């Protein structure tokens, strides 16, 4: 019995060491451009760009399969940052993918909520907490404002509430100079 235990422990140690070595030796580096693009995107995972999340959209941009102006939550600021990073010309937000809206979070009217869990299943970032047949609530710090939870709600108890403007959320305007009149 003791011999079998020692043999199994020895095998586990050897295999663990082999896996640890293999993970270091055969590590696959990702595309650094994809990582930079993904860092600029708002991480709402809303799918409004036509891709299932921000990372696939970043991969499509880096491969030249998608344009930089398909992300409504990122808005004009995100498009400008992507244009600067990729050395492309700025383009306005594509209307077929939506329109830029003020940052908002979902709010559930807990008096109307029937606890169906459809909104929990729809939320890509797990910002809604609750259990079946019990009221749900949104954790505002986690909510990205993607609006994916609104449509599945059978009793329409979810509303998008705009965030109040603070120094962090205020849209600072870019200075615009007319070069022709300045000369």
Curated annotation (Swiss-Prot):
Pfam families: Fer4_21 (PF14697), FeS (PF04060)
Superkingdom per UniProt: Bacteria
Enzyme Commission code: 7.-.-.-
Molecular function GO labels: 4 iron, 4 sulfur cluster binding; electron transfer activity; metal ion binding
Keyword Electron transport: yes
Cofactor: [4Fe-4S] cluster
Enzyme class: translocase
GO biological process entries: electron transport chain
Subcellular location: Cell inner membrane
Domain 4Fe-4S positions: 29-88
PROSITE patterns, sorted: 4FE4S, 4FE4S_FER_1, 4FE4S_FER_2
Keyword Lipid metabolism carried by entry: no
Cofactor note text: Binds 3 [4Fe-4S] clusters.
Family assignment from sequence similarity: Belongs to the 4Fe4S bacterial-type ferredoxin family. RnfB subfamily.
Function: Part of a membrane-bound complex that couples electron transfer with translocation of ions across the membrane.
HAMAP family: RsxB_RnfB
Subunit (UniProt): The complex is composed of six subunits: RnfA, RnfB, RnfC, RnfD, RnfE and RnfG.
PANTHER family the record matches: ION-TRANSLOCATING OXIDOREDUCTASE COMPLEX SUBUNIT B (PTHR42859:SF3), OXIDOREDUCTASE (PTHR42859)
Protein name: Ion-translocating oxidoreductase complex subunit B
Organism: Aromatoleum aromaticum (strain DSM 19018 / LMG 30748 / EbN1)
